Amino acid sequence: EMCIRDRFHLNQPWIRFIKTIYLNFKLLPWNIAVKLPIYLYGPVNLYWLKGKIEIKSNKIYRGMIKLGRNYEYFNGSDGSSFIYMSPKSTIIFNGPCAIGNNYKIRVETNAILEFGEYTFFGSSIKFICTDKIKIGHYTRCAYESQIIDTNSHFVYNEKNNKVARKKGSIEIGDFNWIGNRTTITKGTKTKEGTIVCANSTLNKDFTKLEENHQMLGGIPAKLITSGLKRIFSTKIDKQIEQYFSSNKDEEFYTIKTPFIDNYNDIIYWFKKIM
């Protein structure tokens, strides 16, 4: 279905029915494929498709996973989207997932790319998985970011005559908010509720740090501060927006009651807008 705001957006790509049907029946078990849980939108190239897709969700329904829609409304499809799956490669969806237009997904032999439930990725996102990439539930990653678990080439250290592994796993925690044009490389791990500043490069295990609700940023990224939480509740967000609209000189809004976020609003967003 096309939501109301889509009617006013000329660059919203159409669902590609033939490729949608082909991908579902090519990569999913027949009893799952008939439900057409994956929708492909806009121009997309399908390469090889020798792996498999698993959907680990109690409820599997039509279009719960949407790839290639235009969610951000500042660019159109450029025809560069592709899905490449080598033999014995696996993509796992643990629930609903949305990926914007102009995406690239490449999963190599024996590699596993896993998406948590209700995850969202902006346009021009790039996934290159040669080992294992796991992205936590409710995580959001903005446009033009890339998650790559390999250096692609070995590097010789002439100081100690050693050569490190060129690939390694990536594990992104639940409820992460990753800014645009972020690069996430092998060995990266983040805690639940992490915020990543735009244009950052993550390349290490941040779960070893004691601080929770971390804000990371920089090249390479480091801990900037902690104790910051993105607000997901639509109701609270509107209250704050109204406050600042009515109080032009105020810099901060004070939450006077214990802060309890409503993560169900993420589910609502998926159902009403996705």
Put a short name on every predicted segment:
Residues 5-148, 169-175, 182, 192, ...:
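Domain-scale signature associated with acetyltransferase and cell-envelope carbohydrate enzymes
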Residues 147, 152-158:
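Short helix-loop boundary/capping segments
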Residues 153, 200-201, 207-208:
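Flexible glycine-rich beta->alpha loop in the catalytic core of nucleotide-sugar glycosyltransferases
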Residues 162-170:
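A short acidic, glycine-rich active-site loop
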Residues 179-180, 198:
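Conserved beta-strand->loop/alpha-helix structural units within folded catalytic cores of enzymes
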Residues 185, 195-197, 201:
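A generic "structured core" feature
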Residues 188:
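Short beta-to-alpha loop/turn elements within the nucleotide-binding domains of ABC transporters
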